[in-house]
């Protein structure tokens, strides 16, 4: 009995030991799987940490940091980084990370090509930026040249205008010098008037500064084939009403004309309204006659009688020379 009990106990112990051994082996199996998973996680953790770390700064020969133009390419890494990472990986995760490293290698190659294209684009943009500057400079030079040409044209036009004005002034001076001696033949005593006028012109200022060399107003002279005569307005400017012989003077000056003018000083000349009663007013449309009450008294006289009585004042009548 004892032997049988001991045998059973031995069998139970062996069974228990076998079960324990199997349990131990079973328990050791999950522990080994957990260790493998932890190794894979530990191997993958540096990759995630490496992904989170910023890429190293790349500098060119001048020391300038060369960054890609696109913001999405700032996390790109050189191909050596991915190749070294793939070679340093564990044997267990090598097959798992092989495809991922290949994808990253292709992405790095694409990033490098994009970076090269970006540098080419930057160079092209720099050339384009330099070209508009040169175009702008050439346009500014062309505009300055056009402005200079326009200024020279305006100066030439101004000189031509001044030359024409000088020529016209010289011609007018010559005409006045040619016709002034004829005035002395119009009546007695006119040479004295010329002498007085010349003296006053030398000593006094001209009333017409725009004429320059002319001390008299050319509009006061009427140039006709018969000669040069003073206009009627000249006698009004001279103020001949102060002298008693103004009628005779007006008749003497205007005697060289074929048709005499009104003196403008007598009462009929100063009258401005027609009577509308006389025959001249009634027949004005057919006869073209002036009103009898407005007919100048000096025109009623004969020209010869007026010439005999001419007495000229001592230059005071020609006040426009002063």
Curated annotation (Swiss-Prot):
Q: Where does Zn(2+) 1 bind?
A: 263, 266, 269, 296
Which GO terms label this protein's molecular function in UniProt? DNA-binding transcription factor binding; methyl-CpG binding; sequence-specific DNA binding; zinc ion binding
Query: Which parts of the chain are coiled coil?
Result: none
Residue ranges under compositional bias (Gly residues)? 1-10, 87-97
Determine the domain of life of the protein's source: Eukaryota
Instruction: Recite the UniProt keywords alphabetically.
Output: Cytoplasm, DNA-binding, Metal-binding, Nucleus, Phosphoprotein, Repressor, Transcription, Zinc, Zinc-finger
Which one Pfam family would you cite for this protein?
zf-CXXC
What induces or represses its expression, per the UniProt entry?
By retinoic acid.
Q: Which GO terms describe its cellular component?
A: cytosol; nucleoplasm; nucleus
Localization = Nucleus; Cytoplasm
Mark the residues carrying the PTM Phosphothreonine: 53
Describe, by residue range, where the zinc fingers (CXXC-type) fall in the chain: 256-297
The principal location of this protein is nucleus
Q: Where does Zn(2+) 2 bind?
A: 275, 278, 281, 291
The residues that cross the membrane are none
Motif Nuclear localization signal, residue numbers: 257-262
- Spell out the PANTHER family in the cross-references: CXXC-TYPE ZINC FINGER PROTEIN 5, ZINC FINGER-CONTAINING
The free-text domain remark for this protein reads: The CXXC zinc finger mediates binding to CpG-DNA.
Q: How does it assemble?
A: Interacts with DVL1. Interacts with RBPJ.
Q: What does this protein do?
A: May indirectly participate in activation of the NF-kappa-B and MAPK pathways. Acts as a mediator of BMP4-mediated modulation of canonical Wnt signaling activity in neural stem cells. Required for DNA damage-induced ATM phosphorylation, p53 activation and cell cycle arrest. Involved in myelopoiesis. Transcription factor. Binds to the oxygen responsive element of COX4I2 and represses its transcription under hypoxia conditions (4% oxygen), as well as normoxia conditions (20% oxygen). May repress COX4I2 transactivation induced by CHCHD2 and RBPJ.
Q: What is this protein called?
A: CXXC-type zinc finger protein 5
Q: What is the lineage of its organism?
A: Eukaryota, Metazoa, Chordata, Craniata, Vertebrata
**Gene (name only):** CXXC5
